[in-house]
Amino acid sequence: MKDFLRLELPVLPLRNTVVLPHTTTGVDVGRLKSKRAVEEALSADRLLFLVTQKDPEVDDPAPEDLYAVGTLAVVKQAMRLPDGTLQVMVEARSRARLLSYVAAPYLRAVGEAIPEPPLKDPELARVLVNEVQEAFERYLQNHKTLRLDRYQQEAVKSTRDPAILADLVAHHATWTLEEKQTILETPEVEERLKRVLALLLRDLERFELDKKIAARVKEQMDQNQREYYLREQMKAIQKELGGGEDFLTEIEELRERIEKKGMPEPVKEKALKELKRLERMQPGSPEATVSRTYLDWLLEVPWTEADPEVLDISVTKRVLDEDHYGLKEVKERILEYLAVRQLTQGKEVKGHAPILCFVGPPGVGKTSLGKSIARSMNRRFHRISLGGVRDEAEIRGHRRTYIGALPGKIIQGMKQVGVVNPVFLLDEIDKLSSDWRGDPAAALLEVLDPEQNHTFTDHYLDVPYDLSKVFFITTANTLSTIPRPLLDRMEVIEIPGYTLHEKRAIARYFRWPFQVKEAGLEGRLEITDRAIERIVQEYTREAGVRNLDRELSKVARKAAKDYLEKPWEGVRVVDAEDLEAYLGVPKYRPDRAEKEPQVGAAQGLAWTPYGGTLLTIEAVAVPGTGKVNLTGNLGEVMKESAHAALTYLRAHREEWGLPEGFHKDYDLHIHVPEGATPKDGPSAGITIATALASALTGRPVRMDIAMTGEITLRGRVLPIGGVKEKLLAAHQAGIHRVILPKENAAELKEVPEEILKDLEIHFVEEVGEVLKLLLLPPPPPPAVQPDRPQPGVGA
C-alpha cells in the first residue's frame, strides 16, 4: 500500500453501517450522487472515502450531515443490478480524517489517512488481546442471532495484531452506529481495545440477565401449566363426586372479579392467596364460608370508584343557602376548601380534605349541614352514630379468627356508599366511651389523621385502605369530653344557638312550609310572626330549632284534623292568641330579669351546651362564726371562684365599707337557684363578688344589668367564653346593659348586628369598676340598731 498523506477522493455516504479498517464489506449504492462517486473511483485509482451519516433518514446529505472521521477504502468489485442499484465490494485500508469538501456533482473531499500509531504498552495490549478474544468467543456463544462462519471466527481467534483485532470484533458485533463510530474515532490501539472489551462485557451481562428472565418466565409458564392441569383434574374429580361444578365456577368467577377490581397490588396478592386457600377447601366447610365472606368484603369495598365532584363554588353556595339559614362561618370554610380544589384541579398538589368538627347545642343543624355539604359537592353521604360506642372493634373491626367477625363501622360505611370519596359524618363524637375492650377514640386517631388515614388498617380486612379522599365531618355538643389528641386532628367550627330573629326566619322560610306540605295543607294554612315568636319563647327552651319544628308540626297536624272534620274556605291564619287551642298551656314563661334593685342578689350570665342563660346569684350574711356555705349544685371551679371573690372583699374591706371582722362574725351563704342543674366554671366570679358586697353592706344591686367575668385575688377581671350565647340570653330576657371583660371586646363581631344595637356593653378590667356600676346607695337605716353591725338581708 502506498504512503497516503493528503488525497482528494470521492466520498460515499453510508446510511446504516460503519466500515472499519481491515475488513471487507459489501455496500448497496442506490442514490444518484453516490453512484457517481463510485463510478469516479472506478475510473481512477479505485480509492474513495467511506463516511457514515449522522442521521440515516437524510436522503441528500451535506458535509455537515457526515462524521469527520471515516475510512479510506478500495473498490474491489462493482456490479450493477437490474433495478439500477450498484452492488459494491470495498476493502477498508485505514482510518481517514476529512479536512474539506470540494465542489462537484457528487460528494468529494480532501482527507488524510490516519496510520496506526505504535503501541504505548505492548504488554497491556497483549493482555487486552487475550481478554477480548475470550470475551468475543462467549459473546458469539450467547448471542441469539449473530452467526459467523468458520473462517471469520478463525480470523478473530488467530490474529495477534491488537489494531486488527479491535476493528474485526467491532465490525462483527451488533452494536449501535454511535458505538462503532466511537471505536473508529479512537486512534490509540490500547484505548480502542479497552472500549471494545467494555462493550463486550456489557453485552455479556445483558445476556446473563436475559437468560435469568427467560428462565423465570419459563418457570412461571410451567407453574401456570401445572396449575391449569391440576385445576382441570380437580374439576373432573369434583364432577365425579357430584356438586363440585358450581364451586369451581364460583372460584373462576371470583378470580375474574379480583383481576378486574383494580385493587392495589398488595391487596390483589392477598385476595388471590385467599382464593387459593378456598380452592383447596371443601365447598361446604365452615372455613370455606369464612374465606368466601372475606373475599366478598374485599371485592365489595370500593378501591378506585369515585363520584365526579361539583367544584363550582357558586352552585355550592346556592345549595348551602337553600338548606340552612345563617351559619356564615361554616359555609365560608366549605367554600374556601372548594375554591382551592377548583383552582388546583388536574394538578398534582399535596393536600388533604379538611376534617371539620361542628360543635354546638342540639338542634342547631349540625347533622343536616353535613348532608347539605355532600349534596352541594355531588358526593354520597354516610352517617355513623358514635353515641355510646365503647368498643374499639366498632371502629377497626374484629379479627377473622373470631366467629361472626366483621369489619368496623368505617369499612362497612365505605362498602355501603360504594365510592372512595364520600362525605362521612361521625355523629356525637363527644359521647364516645371506653372500657376493658379498648378505647374507640384512640382508634379514630388513625381515621382522622390526614398523615395516616391513607393506610388505615381494619382488623378484619388486614390490608391498608386509603381514606384520604373521604371528607370527614364530626359533630359534638361540647369539646370538654373529646380527648385532646383526637381534637387536635380536627378543625373546630362552633355553631352557636340561634337568636330569636334567626329562629323566626328558620321557622318562616324553612320549617313551616315543610310542615304545611307534610300535613297536606298547602295554600290553606298560614302562621303569623307573633305566633312563631310566642312558640319560641313559651313552648320551647332550646338553642336549636328541633323542638320548635316539633311544635310547628303539632300545629299543622291539629289543623289537618280540624280541616277534615270541618273544611274551611280560603286560608286559615294561626295567630299568637290561637296557640293554646293547638299546643295547650305554655310550658315556659319567658326568661325575664327582675327590674327592681335587690340586696344580696346579682344578675349573672352563664353558658351551657344548649345555649346561654341568666344566672341569678344570691348571698346572705347572718351572725355566726365565719362559715361559708355554697349551695346550688356547684362544681369545684365555681366554688374556688366564690372563695377568690370573698378573699378579694376581705382585702378591700375599707374601700367598700364592709363590716370589720365580717369573715369571723358572720356566716355567709351563697346560693345559685335551680339546684338540680349542675353548674361550674369561673365566669361567675364578678357576679359572686357583687352579691357578697351587697349582702355585707346592705347596698342594693341593679338587676337591669347582667354580668360575666372571672375574678382574681387582685381584683382583675379575666376573659371568659361563650360571649355570643350569653349576650343572646341577656337580650332575650329583656336586659339591655351587660358587663363584659375588656379582653372579650374582639368577640363582639360574632354577635348579630340586630342584637348588638339593642345592648349597651360595659367593658371592665377591675372588679371595682363592676361594683361602682352596680351598687346603689344603701336604704335608710332601721329605727332600732342592733348591738353589733348587721349586714343587709339577701333577697
From Swiss-Prot:
<dbReference type="InterPro" id="IPR020568">
    <property type="entry name" value="Ribosomal_Su5_D2-typ_SF"/>
</dbReference>
<dbReference type="InterPro" id="IPR027417">
    <property type="entry name" value="P-loop_NTPase"/>
</dbReference>
<dbReference type="GO" id="GO:0005524">
    <property type="term" value="F:ATP binding"/>
</dbReference>
<dbReference type="GO" id="GO:0004252">
    <property type="term" value="F:serine-type endopeptidase activity"/>
</dbReference>
<dbReference type="Pfam" id="PF05362">
    <property type="entry name" value="Lon_C"/>
</dbReference>
<dbReference type="InterPro" id="IPR014721">
    <property type="entry name" value="Ribsml_uS5_D2-typ_fold_subgr"/>
</dbReference>
<dbReference type="Pfam" id="PF22667">
    <property type="entry name" value="Lon_lid"/>
</dbReference>
<dbReference type="InterPro" id="IPR003111">
    <property type="entry name" value="Lon_prtase_N"/>
</dbReference>
<feature type="binding site">
    <location>
        <begin position="360"/>
        <end position="367"/>
    </location>
    <ligand>
        <name>ATP</name>
    </ligand>
</feature>
<protein>
    <recommendedName>
        <fullName>Lon protease 1</fullName>
        <ecNumber>3.4.21.53</ecNumber>
    </recommendedName>
</protein>
<comment type="subunit">
    <text>Homohexamer. Organized in a ring with a central cavity.</text>
</comment>
<dbReference type="InterPro" id="IPR015947">
    <property type="entry name" value="PUA-like_sf"/>
</dbReference>
<comment type="similarity">
    <text>Belongs to the peptidase S16 family.</text>
</comment>
<keyword id="KW-0963">Cytoplasm</keyword>
<keyword id="KW-0645">Protease</keyword>
<dbReference type="InterPro" id="IPR003593">
    <property type="entry name" value="AAA+_ATPase"/>
</dbReference>
<dbReference type="InterPro" id="IPR054594">
    <property type="entry name" value="Lon_lid"/>
</dbReference>
<dbReference type="InterPro" id="IPR027543">
    <property type="entry name" value="Lon_bac"/>
</dbReference>
<dbReference type="GO" id="GO:0004176">
    <property type="term" value="F:ATP-dependent peptidase activity"/>
</dbReference>
<dbReference type="GO" id="GO:0043565">
    <property type="term" value="F:sequence-specific DNA binding"/>
</dbReference>
<keyword id="KW-0067">ATP-binding</keyword>
<dbReference type="Pfam" id="PF02190">
    <property type="entry name" value="LON_substr_bdg"/>
</dbReference>
<dbReference type="Pfam" id="PF00004">
    <property type="entry name" value="AAA"/>
</dbReference>
<keyword id="KW-0378">Hydrolase</keyword>
<feature type="active site">
    <location>
        <position position="683"/>
    </location>
</feature>
<dbReference type="GO" id="GO:0005737">
    <property type="term" value="C:cytoplasm"/>
</dbReference>
<dbReference type="GO" id="GO:0016887">
    <property type="term" value="F:ATP hydrolysis activity"/>
</dbReference>
<feature type="active site">
    <location>
        <position position="726"/>
    </location>
</feature>
<keyword id="KW-0547">Nucleotide-binding</keyword>
<dbReference type="InterPro" id="IPR003959">
    <property type="entry name" value="ATPase_AAA_core"/>
</dbReference>
<dbReference type="InterPro" id="IPR008269">
    <property type="entry name" value="Lon_proteolytic"/>
</dbReference>
<dbReference type="InterPro" id="IPR027065">
    <property type="entry name" value="Lon_Prtase"/>
</dbReference>
<dbReference type="GO" id="GO:0006515">
    <property type="term" value="P:protein quality control for misfolded or incompletely synthesized proteins"/>
</dbReference>
<keyword id="KW-0720">Serine protease</keyword>
<dbReference type="InterPro" id="IPR008268">
    <property type="entry name" value="Peptidase_S16_AS"/>
</dbReference>
<dbReference type="GO" id="GO:0034605">
    <property type="term" value="P:cellular response to heat"/>
</dbReference>
<keyword id="KW-0346">Stress response</keyword>
<feature type="domain" description="Lon N-terminal">
    <location>
        <begin position="9"/>
        <end position="204"/>
    </location>
</feature>
<comment type="function">
    <text>ATP-dependent serine protease that mediates the selective degradation of mutant and abnormal proteins as well as certain short-lived regulatory proteins. Required for cellular homeostasis and for survival from DNA damage and developmental changes induced by stress. Degrades polypeptides processively to yield small peptide fragments that are 5 to 10 amino acids long. Binds to DNA in a double-stranded, site-specific manner.</text>
</comment>
<dbReference type="InterPro" id="IPR046336">
    <property type="entry name" value="Lon_prtase_N_sf"/>
</dbReference>
<feature type="domain" description="Lon proteolytic">
    <location>
        <begin position="596"/>
        <end position="777"/>
    </location>
</feature>
<dbReference type="InterPro" id="IPR004815">
    <property type="entry name" value="Lon_bac/euk-typ"/>
</dbReference>
